[in-house]
Structures are given as structure tokens and as C-alpha cells.
């Protein structure tokens, strides 16, 4: 699988009736999409991102480290305590698929 970027994921974890953001970094990912406009759909679909994270290029990849609503930031970023700590553009996971069949095993993420 071709890769063109890296990704930081902030996964929301509940601990003792409180939430914390667990940070996961993946060096080899395929990123497509981003902020912009479309002549047909306006800002609706133009803000979507599609991300594929190959298992063979990310040895610590675990499907359980992702959830709907988690935060996606392109590139490598530091730990956070809240969403307000994020500098720049970020997306939330809206769809999540674990594609483990065939020769091209990967996690496919949709974000908005």
C-alpha cells in the first residue's frame, strides 16, 4: 500500500468516571481529502478525509485503539488534555473498518 503521511490519533478513554485522551502515532499512512469546497456539494463532502493505515508498515497497530468520535490530526503531535489543546486542523472519526482479509490488511477510517 502506498503511504503519503503520518497520523496522530487521540482516543478517548474513560478512567474512574473521567475522560483522558490516549495518544497514538502512526508513521506510515495514506491520507486523502481535507478542508476545502466542492462545486457540487459545497463544504459538505469536501471536508471529509479518508485514511488507510496498513498493518505491515505499522507494527503496533491495534484496531481497539480507535473509536467513533476520536480525533485525527495529520502529522505527529504532542499529548493533549482537551480538544482545545490541538493546534491546527483536526477531524473526528465518523466511520471505521478493520480490513484484515487478503494481502492488503489495513484499517480504513473516515473522518469529518
Residue ranges of model-derived segments:
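Active-site-proximal polar cores
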Residues: 1-26
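Short, conserved turn/kink motifs that form compact alpha/beta structural patches or helix kinks used as
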Residues: 20-112
Amino acid at each position: 500500500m502506498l503511504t503519503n503521511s503520518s497520523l496522530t490519533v487521540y482516543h478517548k478513554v474513560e478512567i474512574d468516571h473521567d475522560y483522558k485522551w490516549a495518544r497514538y502515532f502512526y508513521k506510515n499512512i495514506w491520507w486523502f481529502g481535507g478542508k476545502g469546497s466542492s462545486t457540487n456539494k459545497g463544504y459538505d463532502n469536501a471536508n471529509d478525509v479518508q485514511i488507510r493505515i496498513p498493518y505491515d508498515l505499522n507494527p503496533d497497530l491495534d484496531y481497539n485503539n480507535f473509536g467513533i468520535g476520536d480525533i485525527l490530526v495529520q502529522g505527529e503531535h504532542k499529548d493533549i488534555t482537551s480538544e482545545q489543546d490541538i493546534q491546527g486542523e483536526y477531524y473526528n472519526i465518523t466511520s471505521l473498518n478493520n480490513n484484515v482479509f487478503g494481502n492488503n490488511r489495513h484499517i480504513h477510517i473516515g473522518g469529518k
